[in-house]
Structure formats: C-alpha cells, structure tokens
Amino acid sequence: MLAIFNIYLDNAFHLNGIILAKLPEAYAIFDPIVDVMPIIPVFFFLLAFVWQASVSFR
C-alpha cells in the first residue's frame, strides 16, 4: 500500500512540473489563452446553474 502511495506522489510531482512549464518562444502569443483554458470547464458548470435558474429549476 505504501509503495502505491509513493508512486502516486512521485507522479503528482512530475505532473506539477509539466503544468508549470513555459511554452516555447514561438507560442508565447498564446500564453494568455493557455492561462484561461483550465477555467473553461468551470464556466460550463456555472452555466448549468444559470440555465436551471432561467427555467425555474423544473
């Protein structure tokens, strides 16, 4: 069990490095878009509540 947890932690640390990596210089113009992209699914989640409120939570 402990070995599985250690593997999980090792993978989590490696993924953090990938997420925080910078884009290559050629794609630097897309930095603002890439910064907003992880938030887009949250907007869809909130849109579901707005939609339900507009139809009175049927």
From Swiss-Prot:
GO terms for cellular component: chloroplast thylakoid membrane; photosystem II reaction center. One of the components of the core complex of photosystem II (PSII). PSII is a light-driven water:plastoquinone oxidoreductase that uses light energy to abstract electrons from H(2)O, generating O(2) and a proton gradient subsequently used for ATP formation. It consists of a core antenna complex that captures photons, and an electron transfer chain that converts photonic excitation into a charge separation. NCBIfam families: PRK02553.1. Its main location: plastid. The keyword Thylakoid applies. HAMAP family: PSII_PsbK (MF_00441). Keywords: Chloroplast, Membrane, Photosynthesis, Photosystem II, Plastid, Reaction center, Thylakoid, Transmembrane, Transmembrane helix. The chain crosses the membrane at residues 29-49. The keyword Transmembrane helix applies. One of its GO terms (biological process) is photosynthesis. It comes from Physcomitrium patens (Spreading-leaved earth moss). It is a single-pass membrane protein. Residues 1-21 form a propeptide. PSII is composed of 1 copy each of membrane proteins PsbA, PsbB, PsbC, PsbD, PsbE, PsbF, PsbH, PsbI, PsbJ, PsbK, PsbL, PsbM, PsbT, PsbX, PsbY, PsbZ, Psb30/Ycf12, at least 3 peripheral proteins of the oxygen-evolving complex and a large number of cofactors. It forms dimeric complexes. It holds the Pfam family PsbK. This is Photosystem II reaction center protein K. Belongs to the PsbK family. It is found in: Plastid, Chloroplast thylakoid membrane.
